[in-house]
Amino acid sequence: MSQSKKIAVQMDPIESIDIKTDSTILMIMEAQERGYSIYHYQPKDLTLKNGTLTARARALSIHLEESNHFKIGDSEIIKLYEVDVVLMRQDPPFDMSYITATHLLEQVHPKTLVVNNPISVRNSPEKIFTTLFPDLMPPTLITRDSEAIRAFRDENKEVIIKPLYGNGGVGIHRFNKNSFNPEILKQYLGLPIMVQEYIKEITQGDRRLIIIDGDYCGSVARLPKEGEIKANFHAGGIPNKTDLVFRDKE
């Protein structure tokens, strides 16, 4: 009898996951369909001892039944070099705990396939990575200099301020010349932030394109609620099936 294939999923507490919006749930269910045994652990459960990386993990099974969508086993220590795949699926913040997890997972990759490559994850924080394509972005500033932020706001009249390493629409604010309050910067704890020109077309939603191995597979529009600027699903954004437009094809 062949040995069961194993996937270890590094993610947030399974109890806190919203099965309606979390794509990791669908990935786990697909892996189950393909015969993989699934183990769940959090970044805090990683241990590196004498060159061996382990995780305090629990066997996990998922089914789409609200309020009763998972079954989880007792904790056990698993050696990550003995599993077939590790999926890095925890949400930001992109802090030292997150970065440390990428360093530890380097110990087993590529003998164990870590998706995505922990080196690439660490070196490509998503908001900074996008600045490699300035022609595809609205005017953008990354800084913690309040005077630079004020000058940028004056240039663009209305701006969006967001934490550089956050997620889910948390900490996003919209300002114009009359509403800007430099005191709001204190909530970012002195860290650099991203400031962008406000694009009024956001009320029509943004689009997420799904690319697999370089091929376009589909897209979804995220629509903000009426009167809101945040289209993030975690912030109440509404999904809507869509397709490519000319700008996307460029």
Descriptions of predicted regions:
Residues 4, 15-142:
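Conserved N-proximal alpha/beta basic substrate-recognition cap immediately N-terminal to
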Residues 123-125, 135-151, 176-183:
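Active-site glycine-rich loop that binds ribose-phosphate moieties when present
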Residues 147, 154-157, 168-250:
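Phosphate-binding site of ATP-dependent enzymes
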